[in-house]
């Protein structure tokens, strides 16, 4: 079964893209305002990954609490959970009965995932510009400033001041499209919601 091409990339990008306070602002201004103001977000997502050989769609839910906490759960067609507790990133693959743990700094510190725990990382890591509108969605084009970022671009779409869509193309030509729903930009989250304990009987690997 094919898994998402780059889970940490996906997590990182989605941490940028939430409902914003001012629907009147341009898409770039809205994105910057979120990174200045927003501390938490929760919701659901549908993700479609297109490669040269196949297309896969997955569904799930997510929670983010700044600084540095996130939980991403794929619920169908497979079950997989990714948790960042501020120090460690845990990836639990239910089908494989396997947990992989990585230092959070090593796993996402040099990638877009740094946005999850650093409100200033967006402007330091990306070049942002307005990228037009389609079907009522206003887009921001985020281009990584470093050539080794692993992807070519990210497009982030807002509709009526709320996150609506995201698209990214990686360095291998794979394209990921994500739609968001049920967004809550003021969720009641505690740090305990981002604690992960490996289930009994699973293999635990370290990166």
UniProtKB/Swiss-Prot annotation:
Coiled-coil positions are none
Annotated keywords: Chaperone, Periplasm, Protein transport, Signal, Transport
Where does this protein reside within or beyond the cell? Periplasm
**Gene Ontology cellular component annotations, sorted alphabetically:** periplasmic space
Q: Which Gene3D superfamilies match?
A: Lipoprotein localisation LolA/LolB/LppX
GO terms of biological process kind: lipoprotein localization to outer membrane; lipoprotein transport
- State the signal peptide span: 1-23
Concerning CDD domains, the annotation shows: LolA
The job of this chain, per UniProt, is described as:
Participates in the translocation of lipoproteins from the inner membrane to the outer membrane. Only forms a complex with a lipoprotein if the residue after the N-terminal Cys is not an aspartate (The Asp acts as a targeting signal to indicate that the lipoprotein should stay in the inner membrane).
Q: What HAMAP family would the database entry show?
A: LolA (MF_00240)
Please give the family membership noted in the entry: Belongs to the LolA family.
Task: List, alphabetically, the NCBIfam families matched.
Answer: lolA
Q: Quaternary form? A: Monomer.
Q: What is this protein called?
A: Outer-membrane lipoprotein carrier protein
Which species is this record about?
A: Neisseria meningitidis serogroup A / serotype 4A (strain DSM 15465 / Z2491)
Taxonomically, what lineage is the organism?
Answer: Bacteria, Pseudomonadati, Pseudomonadota, Betaproteobacteria, Neisseriales
């Amino acid at each position: 079964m094919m898994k998402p091409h780059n889970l940490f990339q996906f997590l990182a990008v989605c941490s940028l893209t939430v409902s914003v306070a001012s629907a009147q602002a341009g898409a770039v201004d809205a994105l910057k305002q979120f990174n200045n103001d927003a501390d938490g977000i929760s919701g659901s997502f549908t993700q479609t990954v297109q490669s040269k050989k196949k297309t896969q769609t997955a569904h799930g839910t997510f929670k983010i609490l700044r600084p540095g906490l996130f939980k991403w759960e794929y619920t169908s067609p497979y079950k997989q959970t990714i948790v960042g507790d501020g120090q460690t990133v845990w990836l639990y693959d239910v089908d494989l009965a396997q947990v992989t743990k990585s230092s959070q700094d090593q796993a996402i510190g040099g990638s877009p995932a740094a946005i999850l725990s650093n409100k200033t990382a967006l402007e330091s890591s990306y070049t942002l510009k307005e990228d037009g509108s389609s079907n009522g969605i206003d887009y921001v084009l985020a281009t990584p400033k470093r050539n080794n970022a692993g992807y070519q671009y990210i497009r982030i779409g807002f509709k009526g001041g709320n996150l609506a869509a995201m698209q990214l193309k990686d360095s291998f030509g794979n394209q990921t499209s994500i739609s968001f729903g049920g967004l809550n930009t003021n969720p009641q989250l505690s740090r305990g919601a981002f604690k992960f304990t490996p289930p009994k009987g699973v293999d635990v690997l370290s990166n």
